[in-house]
């Protein structure tokens, strides 16, 4: 599923049998079984759905009340929306794997639902890059932030991130469709670049790798190297809460999406009928499932980062989320410059 390609299961060799769709097929010969990677993927999908839907809905609910006051809420609200959209598509993807890749949901669902995975990937990493840039400027240029950083700028940055994510998802939407075979009858959902050539397919895979993984990895590594050096050198404590949360979110993103990116690149480079391609494709659904863990892990990180979580979890989970997603002061030298998260000029010198 790095390209979300579902292949029909392996059936007995029918030799030179006709491809006439009206010919009788002995279905007793067709006894496909789920592979071990597919079964593991199904278990992961169930866990992600059960945790990701309520978890991200809770984050959306909590941050929805905070977006007018805090910029952090805007960042994490958009991240939660991206994750929630992907989680809501899980039942259909789950059903397709259970049916050995058979896709009965039509061409429109084939184009839209798997593309949500790529949209989530691009939106998440672009939003994380935006958040990281915000943290970088917040620490290294707090005066600029005090004057210009506000909800309107944050919403504009999120809008740009979503627009770019949609553009990067277009190739998946255009080249995706339902493929039908007649002996035996089988419908699969996947991408088909046969009309444009292998160079386009590899170009899309390289673009996905650069824009959805390597490029952001370089940018984020640079940002957080300087941020951590500054934090450690000045022994800041008040400004590290959100930094630690964002670092945890970023690290989990790259770890969980790495198998997806590797298999996607390998499937684009290997010849489609080679044994290497077949071996890698068997791990496809598992790699997507591992990447999907990213959709439910962020709310867990937010909650675990809240102070007093273990002792007060059952008392007020929304309060714990508000605590960890709140804005905080950023220390500079011996003075504490509190950065505004509201629009009104009078409040730009007040703590949040």
From Swiss-Prot:
Residue intervals on the Extracellular side: 1-38, 95-111, 176-202, 268-284
SUPFAM superfamilies listed in its UniProt record: Family A G protein-coupled receptor-like
GO biological process, any: phospholipase C-activating G protein-coupled receptor signaling pathway
List of residues that carry Sulfotyrosine: 11, 14
Topology of this chain in the membrane: Multi-pass membrane protein
Cytoplasmic compartment segments: 66-70, 134-154, 229-244, 306-352
Disulfide bridges in this chain: 110-189
Residue ranges of the TM segments: 39-65, 71-94, 112-133, 155-175, 203-228, 245-267, 285-305
Top-level division of the source organism's lineage: Eukaryota
InterPro entries: Anphylx_rcpt_C3a/C5a1-2, Formyl_rcpt-rel, GPCR_Rhodpsn, GPCR_Rhodpsn_7TM
Keywords associated with the record: Cell membrane, Chemotaxis, Cytoplasmic vesicle, Disulfide bond, G-protein coupled receptor, Membrane, Phosphoprotein, Receptor, Sulfation, Transducer, Transmembrane, Transmembrane helix
GO molecular function, one term: G protein-coupled receptor activity
Cross-referenced Pfam families: 7tm_1
The record's account of how the chain is modified after translation: Sulfation plays a critical role in the association of C5aR with C5a, but no significant role in the ability of the receptor to transduce a signal and mobilize calcium in response to a small peptide agonist.
Coiled-coil residue windows: none
UniProt subcellular location: Cell membrane; Cytoplasmic vesicle
Record PTM Phosphoserine, positions in chain: 316, 329, 334, 336, 340
GO annotations of cellular component type: apical part of cell; basolateral plasma membrane; cytoplasmic vesicle; plasma membrane
Main location: membrane
Quaternary structure annotation from Swiss-Prot or TrEMBL: Homodimer. May also form higher-order oligomers. Interacts (when phosphorylated) with ARRB1 and ARRB2; the interaction is associated with internalization of C5aR.
Family per record: Belongs to the G-protein coupled receptor 1 family.
Family matches, as PANTHER family: C5A ANAPHYLATOXIN CHEMOTACTIC RECEPTOR 1, CHEMOTACTIC RECEPTOR
Function: Receptor for the chemotactic and inflammatory peptide anaphylatoxin C5a. The ligand interacts with at least two sites on the receptor: a high-affinity site on the extracellular N-terminus, and a second site in the transmembrane region which activates downstream signaling events. Receptor activation stimulates chemotaxis, granule enzyme release, intracellular calcium release and superoxide anion production.
The protein's name: C5a anaphylatoxin chemotactic receptor 1
């Amino acid at each position: 599923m790095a390209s979300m390609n579902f292949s029909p299961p392996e059936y007995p060799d029918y030799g030179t049998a006709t491809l006439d769709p009206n010919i009788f097929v002995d279905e007793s010969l067709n006894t496909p079984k789920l592979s071990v990677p597919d079964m593991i993927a199904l278990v992961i999908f169930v866990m992600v759905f059960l945790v990701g839907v309520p978890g991200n809905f809770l984050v959306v609910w909590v941050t929805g009340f905070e977006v007018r006051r805090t910029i952090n809420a805007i960042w994490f609200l958009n991240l939660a929306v991206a994750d929630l959209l992907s989680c809501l598509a899980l039942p259909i993807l789950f059903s397709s794997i259970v049916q050995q890749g058979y896709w009965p949901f039509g061409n429109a669902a084939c184009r839209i639902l798997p593309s949500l995975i790529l949209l989530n990937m691009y939106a998440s990493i672009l939003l994380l890059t935006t958040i990281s840039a915000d943290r970088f400027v917040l620490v290294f240029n707090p005066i600029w932030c005090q004057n210009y950083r506000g909800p309107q700028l944050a919403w504009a940055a999120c809008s740009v991130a979503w627009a770019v994510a949609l553009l990067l998802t277009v190739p998946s939407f255009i080249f995706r469709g339902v493929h039908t075979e007649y002996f035996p009858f089988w419908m699969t959902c996947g991408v088909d670049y046969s009309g444009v050539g292998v160079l386009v397919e590899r170009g899309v895979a390289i673009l996905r790798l650069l824009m959805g993984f390597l490029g952001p990895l370089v940018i984020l590594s640079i940002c957080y190297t300087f941020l951590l050096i500054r934090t450690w050198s000045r022994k800041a404590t008040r400004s590290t809460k959100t930094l630690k949360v964002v670092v945890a979110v970023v690290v989990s993103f790259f770890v969980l999406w790495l198998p997806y990116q590797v298999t996607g690149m390998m499937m684009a480079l290997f010849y489609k009928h080679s044994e290497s391609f077949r071996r890698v494709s068997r791990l496809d659904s598992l790699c997507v499932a591992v990447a999907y863990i990213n959709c439910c892990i962020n709310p867990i990180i937010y909650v675990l980062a809240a102070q007093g979580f273990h002792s007060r979890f059952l008392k007020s989970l929304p309060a714990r989320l508000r605590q960890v997603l709140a804005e905080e002061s950023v220390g500079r030298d011996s003075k504490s410059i509190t950065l505004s998260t509201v629009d009104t000029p009078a409040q730009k010198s007040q703590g949040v």
